[in-house]
Amino acid sequence: MAVVLALRALGLGDLLTGIPALRALRRAHPVDRIVLAAPPGLAPLARLTGAVDAVLPQPGLDRPLATEDRPSLAVNLHGRGPRSTDLLRATRPGALFAFGSGSQCPQWIDGEHEVDRWCRLLAHYGVPADPADLGLDRPAPASPAPGAVVLHPGAAAGSRRWPVDRFAAVAAALRADGHRVVASCGPSERDLAAAVGAEVVAPDLVELAALVAGAALVVCGDTGVGHLATAYGTPSVLLFGPTPPTEWGPRGGPHTVLWTGGRGDPHGDRPDPGLLRIPVAAVIDAARRAVRAPAAP
């Protein structure tokens, strides 16, 4: 069986924005084995895409791709290269799809929406992809808090973390409206979630997907949790900064994006000034307009 190897050794949001490209590869290679090189913790969600047969553990670009079989096709869904492309070349693929500087390669476009970028890459090589094909299969486990409003104060970088005391104010307002409010967190974010003043839920990745899929509303920054809301069509209020939503935000659907403009360092340690300009009142108002009605007692 031929192997198609796709590299996207990044985070949760990166995996989810890459779904249309992965599904396009699946349609183009229906009988081949699609292998995704990605962090091993993402394997359970990769399986929910319905496009991936196996995950090759690859937490970054610091080690070679440990492939057992020479791929018939290697696809760089990771970045513009050269490191990521060189890793794929080292597997000696029969063909390689990647951005590059040569006249025969598609060119990287700064500021392009992340979903569109990888769809365009594949289209250059004759593989059509649908940028709207972002849905994810629902996981088997039930939600740990069905019908709740989910606030997620964490983010991979401090520059994308809206202050936790503001999340606490939003939680208090929505709880007063009659909603069950929970604060979700990763393993290292329990103290941050506890400061929201709501019930803390610390799910694993599959449970997190179930939590978001069954939520009445998600409120978070520019994080993978927001992309889960997009994947499941869950209403969301997304607080953007310092990266603009034109590059990473949802398009259409029951999602409200708050963004005050201005770019900054998406990997910085301190909250972005633009993110700090989003007031509590605006988030509460957006949440009240977006939230599904609270469940009957």
Segments predicted by a language model, with ranges:
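Catalytic machinery of carbohydrate-active enzymes
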Residues: 1-297
